[in-house]
Amino acid sequence: MNRKKGDKGFESPRPYKLTHQVVCINNINFQRKSVVGYVELTIFPTVANLNRIKLNSKQCRIYRVRVNDLEAAFIYNDPTLEVCHHESKQRNLNYFSNAYAAAVSAVDPDAGNGELCIKVPSELWKHVDELKVLKVHINFSLDQPKGGLHFVVPNMEGSMAERGAHVFSCGYQNSTRFWFPCVDSYSELCTWKLEYTVDAAMVAVSNGDLVETVYTHDMRKKTFHYMLAIPTAASNISLAIGPFEILVDPYMHEVTHFCLPQLLPLLKHTTSYLHEVFEFYEEILTCRYPYSCFKTVFIDEAYVEVAAYASMSIFSTNLLHSAMIIDETPLTRRCLAQALAQQFFGCFISRMSWSDEWVLKGISGYIYGLWMKKTFGVNEYRHWIKQELDQIVAYELKTGGVLLHPIFGGGKEKDNPASHLHFSIKHPHTLSWEYYTMFQCKAHLVMRLIENRISMEFMLQVFNKLLSLASTASSQKFQSHMWSQMLVSTSGFLKSISNVSGKDIQPLIKQWVDQSGVVKFYGSFAFNRKRNVLELEIKQDYTSPGTQKYVGPLKVTVQELDGSFNHTLQIEENSLKHDIPCHSKSRRNKKKKIPLMNGEEVDMDLSAMDADSPLLWIRIDPDMSVLRKVEFEQSDFMWQYQLRYERDVVAQEEAILALEKFPTPASRLALTDILEQEQCFYRVRMLACFCLAKIANSMVSTWTGPPAMKSLFTRMFCCKTCPNIVKTNNFMNFQSYFLQKTMPVAMALLRDVHNLCPKEVLMFILDLIKYNDNRKNKFSDNYYRAELIDALANSVTPAVSVNNEVRTLDNLNPDVRLILEEITRFLNMEKLLPSYRHTITVSCLKAIRVLQKNGHVPSDPALFKSYAEYGHFVDVRIAALEAVVDYTKVDRSYEELQWLLTMVQNDPVPYIRHKILDMLTKNPPFTKNMESPLCNEALVDQLWKLMNSGTSHDWRLRCGAVDLYFTLFGLSRPSCLPLPELGLVLNLKEKKAVLNPTIIPESVANNQEPVNTTNNHGQPVVFQNTEDDHLIKETASSISGHQQGVKRKADMPLGSPLEPGQILEKNEDSKVKLKIRFSNSQEEEEIDMDTVHDSQAFIYHHLNMLERPSTPGKEQSSGEVTMHPVSAAPLSVFSKESNSSKHSDHHHHHHHEHKKKKKKTLQVWIRP
């Protein structure tokens, strides 16, 4: 949405306003995984000639549609089921991405479109002209849905409730259309009545207030009635049904928690903290939680760990934990806090359009960050900001940029705001999952930049203002035009900021929101003793992909002998050098304490520093107030001072990373001091362990004394009397617990002169395992033991093979034998006494793969494949799959690649399917620039089919398939495909002649859009035969020039550039002829399209078959057209409107006979 337009407020793309919707699901069958129900939408027309109503619906089989109790005809068409039609041999990704973006837009509710088009009965036209209310009643069913609703039905004895069978709604972005017909847009708000009839042993949890629960006469079923009086988008409606155990929150009675059977004790502990999160958000936003109740539901096989919907959130059951578990506690609390932040911004306040998504994700991420700062402290908060900043910088530099606010011009691809990507960013459903994750990360970082500019106080006032307006609007029961106040837009948000703070943040928005890219600084300095000036040089790289030029203020902090000083430099167009005056003279003779930034004064040993310079260390942009990467050069002693004495954790982490390049005794000492300092933040100490191991390896020839960290570990955690025996575990001090876990893992990375792990270190780790005693500890040690196995894996080095001997148990290296025995013992113990989240199994599987890769045990995926099967715990499956993916790459195994791809198609768990594609993309068996035996035509076809039609039920999965295809084959036609024959395809059903699409040269294909051939008047050029005009009337599209769904059968439309030597002609008498000029002569052959039409009519009369109509949502051959003659209104009325979009797979559904028309394609091959 453009800003200029945005100032007028919300303009609906639909010719009606939805005010209320009823969803009634009166039958759920867990055995068959099916759902039957109806919806009723209350619609107010906003234009007098409303005669079509477009709604969203995927997978639903629609039985009957009534408008105000009159039967209504409808057309169902979903161009996303099959993006490029199957006669196409197109295999380049550019083509697919354009076609996919077009298909998604063709049914995008934000453009007023939908898969379901309902014809308003002619009897109601007068009623509509008076703008009177319409009630649209739709009966539908779902049979084994592949997306939107996920059934979990354990295969065991007993009733469904005893088995713990449950079902829940899920999906990426607006995916409600997958389980009931609706307007699946975040900007169409209405009130809701939700009814679910379930078995008496089941509980249905949904949005809003539970009004009543009514049992049937035989007491075998009950109906849950929910009312949601706050106007809400269909995309924020959710459902969970299962034999849940129920816990009313003891601190807040309006909050209810639900979990699967026998997990109630874990639920009590996990949610005991939630009321504090509520209090925090209500306090900072000075606003009550917007709904009258809140429900948390913990389910198995979750789509994502946290999914927020209006007044309820669905969580993964794996987040539940007992009081004995340390590591999971902060992670789960963070998930709960994220979900609650999204209740305010995301569910209660919704977005006006996709280009405003960044505002909601930014605000919810920002207030979640404030909660984190209060709960875990400033150090943890700053560490998190640094981590997020590093992630977004790495991603943007790798892919070329993340754009928060894509403003779409005329909708042409040449205005494509992200031409560097292999997918369109104009719609959430075309985005790579990784891109969307990074998008959310960047959004909250930009909110923090806005806070730096206007202050936190004003920031919170803006949020409060947005919530107050929305709250007032939501209580306007009969003034639905007021509800748009509950939608946030970029322009509205910026207006609010300028009203509240009086500050102009336009330059900041222009820099970080309206354009993509991060800043890359390179800094170095010299001290001019004569002038007592620090000469700082700052260069920028703004030519690499993903970078942008920064002009503006930049803070530099200089720590001198007399204290710490902040300087703000103005980064101009060309300025590189900046002179900064120094405050201190170099005076090292006076013994005086040195003041630090936080007011502390410390004694320092200044013997290491440069005698002529008063500078201790320098930091560029210490507050991370620019999205940037800084590479700064200063001497090793300055990094050592910075590590020891700078109190900011980010500065300490930067110093540790820099010291890896300076392996000297002084660096070793600085790192050891940090490890011993108990006041130092535990994450910094953990990082120092790994840096110390790297330095020790670089200094291996000059290192003296015991291996790095060994004496420190012994002193901290071992018995005084017997230093090789570890004390009984006591994890009461969490900081030392994390250090105790990390040190052995880092020590195992030590190597001697022969590049082997020192025997002393290996024996030390084996002793830690042997003497580990957790009997007196009140906390579980499962994470600690898992890290000890990781340490064993880290100690493994490549095997030295003699005469290519085959590895057997008898000739195993004795050290490796010890490691393998421990791993086997751990794995067997796990079967008897499984650890929390099976952390031990996960570490063992990773260790076995390390042994395989290093040549100690035969490389074989069989063990991993057995652990990857459905039924194992999800973390175990992912660890096993990671090993199979790695094996596929290292051993170039086509068989395992096929096994993985079969799993992507058939595994019952959506998250696992998504993860396999993700792992293959990150660790691919080959890439577009390599020759590989795995790259063949069958694989190309298989992956093409997967992304083209095999993943239409899950947006995230389809985008994952696109990512993998891009990684393996790139944007153009895969190199392993044979060159196609030159050919012309005549498509009889389409009545179009098309060049064989496989032979478009890449230069053309790369710019190709699946655009309809249009003549000057914007009408599609279609060869039409009047005799079946009444069947399918061609009409131009309502969406801008390049209509998506229209006639998208022809893969290379006539509008595309033709090969040299081919001419398309239309004669005055409108006889269409196609001329083909052979390259070796000047003669032209003509094909008369009339002949084609005659044969088309002939085929039409002979191929009419009577068949049951295919179910909308089930993929079908693209040529099928299901016709239902309508008794109420003659079909010719369908052609009445000229703006209706006409798509590829048409189902004119009604309750009469069904005819199916088969498609024939005549191919004329021409050989030059």
UniProtKB/Swiss-Prot annotation:
One of its GO terms (molecular function) is transcription cis-regulatory region binding. Residues 1039-1066, 1135-1168 are annotated as: Disordered. It comes from the Eukaryota. It is found in: Nucleus. GO terms for cellular component: transcription factor TFIID complex. The keyword Transcription applies. The keyword Nucleus applies. Component of the TFIID basal transcription factor complex, composed of TATA-box-binding protein TBP, and a number of TBP-associated factors (TAFs). This is Transcription initiation factor TFIID subunit 2. It comes from Gallus gallus (Chicken).
